[in-house]
């Protein structure tokens, strides 16, 4: 097997808050994949950094009464500590506010500019007259122009999933002051993305991408690529644009360059690793980004186009994952399920979560649910009851009957050959990011080993005379099987693996060691490696999280003069044909981050199909059979995925969205008045 040379990154956490379990999904996924590559003997480097620029950081530092640099140092130290607590093994964790990143950002920009890829044009944008600052999209809220949902951000609606310009919002207000923004003109710099349309279409066919993301990208191409605004006006926290007064690079320009900046800093500290080998020269190296599905646009369009324009190597692949829900719902501060990484670590071992997340992950772009009851049961059953139990059951027999030394040859090797025979299957699962399948394969093998113990019954043999050799054989087979299982799970459970290697008196194991049996080998006395999760521990975690976040909650800024909607007459209301509809089927729409597709029974109106942008808030299966409130006479809307024939009504606020449900006495087709 030839040695591969691989660069890997996770998306950069924003340096404006703490790491939470949503972040950990991505970093656990990336870390497992990197550890697997290293276990196979490949040269694999994993870097990350804090995303350290933007208006939000400037305002946060101002609010705390410190400089942005002081804030960034505090947050970066906290982030590094949290990631290390979860056994995330970054080779280097940097910051985008660094000399390396400034130099690379300027180099890329100047190259793009010299090749004619940078445009200038005057734009009008919203400005807070009280704070005297141009407002980023996420600092503007108002009523969605498509579905009329209140308090939606300036770039997209979390209720219906629509995207729009901040100027399209109805009754917009600044989240900083509550003031109504005014329009103000400014000259901005744009990256001419449409020039790269043909290149991107070609790259997307060659790159390692998931089918769902290819569908999404096809949708974006169909809509047409637009020049990308890469500048922001002072006051702003970031890198100044060369030869441009009071202009700064938009955070999303220098943030992905941060992957390169972090790797360059690592290479400067480790001279045997060449930055140019991975990013400048056409060597046989690989480059992969692990990201959330919500930032695919930046990583699959802007980023490869920038690299192409600057004459740098492009990503070999970009791997997207879904969002994390807890107990089937969006993470909630009020329910205590918005859990910070450091809060989790106060109560539970990191490998519990690493294992559970791994068991849920696949190569698909799917959301992951952390069901806390299932989490406890799976950890207790799989890790404590099946895996660690093998060592705890067999080690005492080896100590008692063979002086802690395994046999010189296995008389019955069928079970061990079964385990070794799965090595390439499990390796393929890891390589393809099918971690859930890999875990299931390993646990099926653990079941087979436990069945072997139950069949051979060494505890019965121990009561008979003359059975020492047979018992030593059984214990040696089980401990060898335990060693193999530990190697298979080492990318997921690095600390348990290290403890197991110490117990077995082995040097750090690699994938190649699968074929090297542990014969005539002395082991140490067994000591517990993992404890069961108690329900009380989970309850304490939730309570701690709830109390911690309650203390941080502040009253949100309200618009200073946000008028209510204009009055309507009863005749206006009567124009709406509101009906009760029964959900016959509901499923996620492949290629869409937000949409669910409903098949509805509307009584005498027949069957209707509706698309609704509520995927983040509801699991499809929980809605089947429910009675919902349906707008029957809304004009059908043609979408990429089909025609939406009406609308399902929901209630929402800043934190949550819930479909309106009718009680059990209602029937499909009933009118609402």
Swiss-Prot record:
Its cofactor is Zn(2+). Pfam families: Anticodon_3, tRNA-synt_1g, tRNA_bind. The keyword Acyltransferase does not apply. Keywords: Aminoacyl-tRNA synthetase, ATP-binding, Cytoplasm, Ligase, Metal-binding, Nucleotide-binding, Protein biosynthesis, RNA-binding, tRNA-binding, Zinc. Its EC number is 6.1.1.10. Belongs to the class-I aminoacyl-tRNA synthetase family. MetG type 1 subfamily. This is Methionine--tRNA ligase. It comes from Dichelobacter nodosus (strain VCS1703A).
């Amino acid at each position: 097997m030839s040695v591969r040379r691989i660069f890997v990154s996770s998306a950069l956490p924003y340096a404006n808050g703490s790491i939470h379990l949503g972040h950990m999904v991505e970093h656990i996924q990336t870390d497992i994949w990197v550890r697997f590559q290293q276990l196979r003997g490949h040269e694999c480097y994993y870097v990350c950094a804090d995303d350290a620029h933007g208006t939000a950081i400037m305002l946060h530092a101002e609010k705390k009464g410190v400089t942005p640099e002081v804030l960034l140092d505090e947050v970066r130290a906290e982030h590094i500590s949290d990631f290390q607590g979860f056994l995330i093994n970054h080779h280097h964790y940097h910051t985008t506010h660094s000399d390396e990143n400034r130099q690379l950002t300027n180099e890329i920009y100047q190259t793009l500019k010299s090749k004619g890829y940078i445009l200038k044009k005057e734009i009008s944008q919203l400005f807070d007259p009280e704070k005297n600052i141009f407002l980023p999209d996420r600092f503007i809220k108002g009523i969605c122009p498509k579905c009329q949902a209140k308090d939606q951000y300036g770039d997209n609606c979390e209720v219906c999933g629509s995207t729009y310009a901040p100027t399209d919002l109805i009754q917009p207000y600044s989240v900083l002051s509550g003031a109504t923004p005014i329009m103000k003109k400014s000259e901005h710099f744009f990256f001419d993305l449409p020039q790269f349309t043909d290149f991107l279409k070609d790259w997307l066919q060659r790159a390692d991408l998931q089918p769902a993301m290819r569908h999404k990208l096809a949708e974006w191409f169909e809509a047409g690529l637009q020049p990308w605004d890469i500048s922001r006006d002072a006051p702003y926290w970031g890198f100044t644009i060369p030869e441009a007064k009071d202009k700064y690079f938009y955070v999303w320009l220098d943030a992905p360059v941060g992957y390169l900046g972090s790797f360059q800093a690592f290479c400067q500290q480790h001279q045997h690793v060449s930055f140019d080998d991975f990013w400048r020269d056409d060597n046989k190296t690989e480059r992969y980004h692990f990201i959330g599905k919500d930032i695919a646009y930046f990583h699959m369009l802007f980023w490869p186009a920038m690299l192409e324009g600057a004459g740098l190597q492009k990503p070999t692949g970009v791997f997207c994952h879904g969002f994390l829900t807890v107990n089937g719902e969006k993470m909630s501060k009020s329910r205590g399920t918005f859990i910070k990484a450091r809060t989790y670590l106060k109560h539970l071992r990191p490998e519990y979560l690493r294992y559970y997340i791994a068991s849920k992950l696949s190569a698909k772009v799917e959301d992951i649910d952390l069901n806390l009851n299932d989490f406890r049961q799976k950890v207790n059953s799989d890790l404590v009851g099946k895996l660690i139990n093998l060592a705890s059951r067999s080690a005492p027999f080896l100590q008692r009957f063979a002086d802690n030394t395994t046999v010189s040859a296995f008389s019955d090797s069928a079970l061990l050959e079964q385990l070794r025979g799965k090595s390439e299957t499990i390796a393929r699962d890891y390589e393809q990011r099918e971690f859930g399948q890999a875990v299931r394969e390993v646990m099926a093998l653990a079941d087979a080993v436990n069945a072997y113990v139950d069949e051979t019954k060494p505890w019965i043999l121990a009561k008979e005379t003359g059975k020492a050799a047979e018992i030593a054989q059984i214990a040696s087979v089980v401990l060898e099987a335990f060693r193999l299982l530990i190697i298979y799970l080492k990318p997921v459970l690095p600390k348990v693996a290290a403890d197991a290697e110490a117990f077995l008196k082995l040097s750090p194991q690699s994938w190649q060691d699968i074929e090297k049996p542990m014969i005539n080998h002395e082991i140490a006395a067994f000591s517990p490696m993992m404890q069961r999760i108690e329900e009380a521990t989970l309850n304490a975690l939730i309570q701690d999280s709830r109390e911690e976040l309650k203390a941080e909650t502040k009253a949100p800024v309200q618009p200073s003069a946000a008028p209510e909607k204009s009055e309507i007459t009863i005749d206006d209301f009567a124009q709406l044909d509101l009906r009760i509809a029964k959900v016959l089927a509901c499923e996620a729409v492949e290629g869409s981050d937000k949409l669910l597709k409903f098949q509805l029974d509307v009584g005498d109106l027949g069957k209707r199909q509706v698309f609704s942008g509520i995927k983040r808030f509801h699991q499809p299966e929980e809605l089947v059979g429910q009675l919902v409130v349906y707008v029957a006479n809304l004009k059908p809307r043609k979408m990429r995925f089909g025609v939406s024939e009406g609308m399902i009504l929901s209630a929402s606020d800043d934190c949550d969205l819930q479909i309106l449900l009718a009680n059990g006495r209602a029937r499909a087709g009933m009118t609402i008045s």
